Amino acid sequence: MKISSVIAVVVVMLGSSLGACSHSGQLGPKATPAKAAATNVQLAIEYMKLNKLADSQEFIGRALKEDPGNANVQLTAGLVYERLNDMPKAEKAYATAARLGKNDPNIQNDYAGFLCRTGKNAAGEKLFVNVARNPLYQTPEVALVNAGVCVRSTGDMLDAQRYFNRALAVRPNMPEALLQLGNVAIDAGDGADALDYVQRYLAVNPATPEVLWLGFRAQRKLGDATAAAVFARRVQSEFPNSEQAQMMRAGVDR
């Protein structure tokens, strides 16, 4: 799982955003710097979704010139520069966003994710916990799962399980928490426990290639080839273009 990232800006469709600009991409003469920056942030995000990173970089560069003191502009710059693998610029932008948006738990959550992705796990974990405790943050279970993923990446499975279970205490049957606990179990060689999490997940949540893949691995671990084949067929039929389906076609089973 990737650390969840919530950008606190309104993203408009690319066509609508382009319609607000001239052919050259310049905004109308009546646009204030803040409005111009907001539109350029939207364009940067949409181009990033299309994997047109050069265009995304151009528009976020404009936004940074127009409204550098805006936390969401800096946050989006961090995302763009991270995608470009320009980590010094990404780190500077994320840190600036966190400073400017110190009272915005969504921005703090995003910064914590960046810290964890760049090896600063202790700082990221601490920040995720603070976000989860913030009464202004409406989904503390998300921050708790993120904290669990962060510490799991360091090999600390006990703390990871603790965070995932805390997330379930806030939101019973949260799909990502169940999936993460199942993955911890299968990595520990416990097929029965992993299968239990898969069954709990599927009882109340739609299937995903990730959870079906986990079910396949759990049944293989338990030695039930017939049941494993059922999960394999579901992955191939319901999610034929998924990474998991491709791994199955390549003969990868773990």
Please report, for each region that a protein language model flagged, where it lies by residue.
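Bacterial Sec signal peptide processing site at the extreme N-terminus
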Residues: 15-37
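Terminal, low-structured helical/coil segments at or just beyond the last alpha-helical repeat
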Residues: 27-30, 34, 205-254
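Structural marker of alpha-solenoid helical repeat scaffolds
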Residues: 32, 66, 99-101, 134-136, ...
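Canonical tetratricopeptide repeat
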Residues: 42, 76, 110, 144-146, ...
